[in-house]
Amino acid sequence: QSKVVTDSIYSQVLKAHRAYTIYLPQSYSNETDRKYPILYLLHGMSGVNTSWFTDQRVKDVMDQLVASGEACEMIIVSPNAGGNPATCWNGYFNMPGWAYEDFFYKEFLPYIEKTYRVKGDKRHRAIAGLSMGGGGTASYAQRYPDMYCAAYAMSALMNIPVSGEEVGRDPDPTNKMAVLTRSVQEHSC
């Protein structure tokens, strides 16, 4: 039986616990010498680490895909990148007072790949995300092309509000961080 587990990691970078939810395939508990490919699955704005597993039923979908032979067994992990859902969602990027990208690459990814039996190389590591998570996916795939064999950015959010800005409010565009746009400019050929 596959399983979904929610846990947390303390981040020295963010000075806080950050939750994550992880899908472990059916053979994970029995085949203790086996390592698995991994998909980092980034939630959208107003989502949390559990959203992919509750709203989009990742466990059920993966179990069906593996059973039909359409997908191989893999580990899927979704970290929480949200802030206060009523006001601000800082997301997957570094900005004043929020160094999430540093946390992701210096703490989270190494922790996951050490704690769980992950094939921790480019050939076996992918990233995907929706909305805010799609923006994180596109930016990370461009900034760290040697890290991922595949990236899937769904409806990528281009403008990330400045930390503390109210979601849905449209402040002066000169005050917004267009992280993905900047990433495209800096990392494209």
What are these regions (language model features)?
Residues 1-189:
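Non-catalytic cap/lid and distal C-terminal segments of serine-dependent acyl enzymes
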